[in-house]
Each structure stands twice: as C-alpha cells, then as structure tokens.
C-alpha cells in the first residue's frame, strides 16, 4: 500500500461503509487478480492522471466495459489502435449551485493556499489562482475532480439522498 495515500484511502473506505455504498475494498487479498477480473461486470478507473494506464488495456483483455475518465494523453493511442473506450467521460460536471460558488471558491482556494504555503509562495501566485478559480466557476459547472475531498463527499451524500440531483449529474 502507498503510505502517502493510506490516510485518504481509510477515510474514503469509512465514508463508503457509513453510507452503505455498494463498494468493495481489498478484494485483492481474497482473490487472485484474474478471479477479480472474471467476476467483474465492469472495470472502473477513478484516475484523473496516469502513467501508463494498464486498466484501459486490462478491460479489453477480459472483455469488460471500462467506466471512468477519458485521459486523452493515455487513451488516444489506445483508441487509434481500435480499443473501444466509448464508455469513458471527459469530465464529471457538477452544477456549482449544488454547493454554492462561494463555498466552492473558499474550499478550493484555502486548500491551494495551504498547499503552496509549504512552498515559497507569493501574492502574485495567489492572485493568479484567484482569477483562474473565478474563471472556472463562472461557467456554472465544475469538474468533480477539481473539488476538495470534503466537497466531493458532500456531492456524494447529496446524490445518495436526492435521486433528482443524481439524475441531473448523469445528464
């Protein structure tokens, strides 16, 4: 296990368990990789960045649909060679009204300032971030991947409770 991600993983695992979401964790400890793939109805990738993207090929080898984000820097070569990745999405748009633009801005900007605070930062960098974030939010939608974990959890809670919100995101 990746030590850097262990705390975050534990939080997401607890969150899924608390909500009784249909998620399974650590199946690799109980079954072989081949058994897991054979038992799957589909494979899911949650990555927003990849090095090679093995899951994009593995799904084809076991003839299972792959659900998740299309990463053009990885997937374009695969698609150009006949691999069907049509079930992937470019972005998961969340209407900013679900959370409120001010809340989204404050949460993301605060996380950004905390992260760059560990580096040598300047007011100019913060102003650039301020303008970029305002520009992003001006469209009325934001990509789920850009949200902080606390905002992602809020969206998940909302769609679990409110099927209309879930439906509007899927559209």
Question: Residue spans of the language-model regions?
Answer:
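Nucleotide-activated donor-binding/catalytic signature segment of Leloir-type glycosyltransferases, i.e.
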Residues: 6-31, 81-98
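Short acidic alpha-helix that forms the nucleotide-activated donor recognition element
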Residues: 29-40, 61
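Aromatic "clamp/platform" in nucleotide-sugar-dependent glycosyltransferases that forms part
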Residues: 48
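Short amphipathic alpha-helical segments and helix-helix/interface helices
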Residues: 9-13, 37, 56-57, 75
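A short hydrophobic beta-strand element within the catalytic core of glycosyltransferases
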Residues: 43-44
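Catalytic binding pocket for nucleotide-activated donors in carbohydrate/polymer assembly enzymes
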Residues: 52, 57-171
């Amino acid at each position: 296990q990746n030590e850097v991600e262990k705390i975050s993983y534990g939080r997401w695992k607890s969150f899924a368990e608390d909500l009784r979401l249909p998620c399974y964790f650590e199946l690799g400890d109980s079954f072989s990789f081949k058994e897991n793939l054979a038992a799957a109805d589909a494979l899911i990738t949650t990555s927003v960045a990849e090095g090679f993207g093995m899951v994009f090929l593995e799904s084809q080898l076991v003839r299972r649909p792959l659900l998740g984000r299309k990463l053009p820097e990885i997937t374009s070569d695969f698609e150009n060679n006949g691999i069907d990745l049509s079930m992937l999405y470019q972005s998961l748009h969340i209407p900013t009204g679900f959370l409120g633009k001010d809340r989204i801005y404050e949460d993301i900007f605060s996380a950004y300032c905390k992260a760059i605070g560990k580096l040598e930062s300047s007011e100019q960098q913060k102003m650039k971030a301020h303008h970029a974030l305002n520009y992003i939010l001006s469209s009325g939608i934001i990509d789920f991947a850009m949200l902080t974990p606390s905002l992602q959890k809020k969206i998940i809670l909302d769609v679990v409770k409110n099927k209309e919100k879930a439906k509007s995101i899927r559209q």
